[in-house]
UniProtKB/Swiss-Prot annotation:
GO terms for biological process: axis specification; BMP signaling pathway; convergent extension involved in gastrulation; heart looping; left/right pattern formation; neuron development; nodal signaling pathway; positive regulation of cell division. This is Protein DVR-1. One of its GO terms (cellular component) is extracellular space. It comes from Danio rerio. The lineage of its organism: Eukaryota, Metazoa, Chordata, Craniata, Vertebrata. It is found in: Secreted. Glycans are attached at residues 108, 179, 296. Disulfide bonds join 254-320, 283-352, 287-354. InterPro entries: Cystine-knot_cytokine, TGF-b_C, TGF-b_propeptide, TGF-beta-rel, TGFb_CS. Keywords: Cleavage on pair of basic residues, Disulfide bond, Glycoprotein, Growth factor, Mitogen, Secreted, Signal.
């Protein structure tokens, strides 16, 4: 509930008039609920994968009954991250100087909050070129877990463990998928995360080429898709009632009022991808005596209104507050330039009542 009130305060200064420092405190509180320690400043706006757009559009539909299932991957979750590889190219030893590329892959799993339950971590390796364009060659893709490292890097075979080996021939699918859920779970402790080593090399050269002929190794882009569940932000989606459609007739009684939050107005448009804004609404109005059924008053509010009618100076009227809220899904860049899709409860005021 405080999330809606926070935005209302920042946008309707005439009503709330928070000091600048108070506004920063409220912003930090909201950002922390998103797992962010500060306002993200993306170094570059990475393209949003098509799968992420599909999940976002599906999650935004009001017909979805369980917002805590990511049907695209068949697992439970309300947070989806596309993590960027933070590793680098490794200088190959002389014995592999021809037709072989080694790369260190690293994904920072410590960005997950402690409360999050990891459901899936899937490595997606995509080739930037069509393998058919590189000639009739067979490539091997070997993925290793790095067990330990030194200042010189991974220096011995005992320092790594083979996770998967795969061959790719012309016409093969342009991507390789590897389930790393169990390994990624251990990576949540930074001291256990040494990353992985990817080795890509030519297995068979065309008979027309001699042993030391150079064959172009395709560039490869690695991403780790991480799906997790925050149980504190996961409730069954409630269908909006007719009261969601705000009445247009003027009235001073307690009811939802229109409030559209545009993220550009608060300077967040550079890191929030979608939506660009949303209808949050707020509650405002009087709770007059006698309270009608339409004002959704509690027994306590009814009695308080009765006492107020006899002693208006000593007893205030009940307050007009949100009693029913609904969630939204947000797509944004986090502090590590990862693309994140997250489901948030209590973001839209649907109904108000006297309390």
């Amino acid at each position: 509930m405080f999330l809606v009130l926070l935005r209302a305060c920042l946008l309707t200064l005439s009503l709330c008039s928070p000091a600048e420092d108070d506004g920063l405190v409220q912003e930090k509180l909201f950002l922390s609920s998103m797992g962010l320690w500060s306002r993200p400043k993306p170094s570059h706006h990475a393209a949003v994968p098509s799968q992420m757009w599909k999940i976002f559009k599906q999650a935004s539909k009001q017909t979805v009954n369980d917002p805590c299932v990511v049907s695209e991957y068949g697992v439970r979750g309300n947070i989806v991250r596309f993590m960027q590889d933070q590793g680098s190219l490794i200088s190959a030893p002389a014995v592999h100087s021809f037709n072989c590329v080694r790369k260190h892959l690293f994904f920072n799993m410590s960005v997950l909050e402690e409360v999050e339950q990891l459901s899936l971590a899937q490595l997606e390796m995509k080739f930037k070129q069509d393998l058919l364009l590189l000639g009739p060659h067979v490539f091997s893709v070997d993925l290793y877990r790095v067990l330990k490292t030194t200042l010189k890097g991974v220096t011995h075979e005992s320092s790594r463990k083979l996770l998967q080996s795969q061959t790719l021939s012309p016409g093969a699918h342009a991507s390789v998928l590897v389930n790393l859920t169990n390994l990624a779970q251990s990576w949540r402790k930074p001291e256990k995360n040494f990353g992985m080593q990817l080795e890509l090399q030519v297995m068979h050269l065309n008979n027309m080429l001699h042993d030391h002929a150079y064959v172009q190794i395709p560039d490869i882009h690695a991403t780790l898709v991480v799906v997790s569940l925050n149980p504190l932000q996961c409730r069954s989606r409630r269908k909006r009632s007719a009261s969601y459609y705000l009445p247009v007739t003027p009235s001073n009684v307690c009811k939802p009022r229109r409030l559209y939050i545009d993220f550009k107005d608060v300077g967040w448009q550079d890191w929030i991808i979608a939506p660009q804004g949303y209808l949050a609404n707020y509650c405002h109005g009087e709770c007059p005596f006698p309270l009608s059924e339409s004002l959704n008053g509690t027994n306590h509010a009814i009695l308080q209104t009765l006492v107020h009618s006899f002693d208006p100076k000593g007893t205030p009227q009940p307050c007009c507050v949100p009693i029913k809220l609904s969630p939204i899904s947000m797509l944004y860049y986090d502090n590590n330039d990862n693309v994140v899709l997250r489901h948030y409860e209590d973001m839209v005021v649907d109904e108000c009542g006297c309390r």
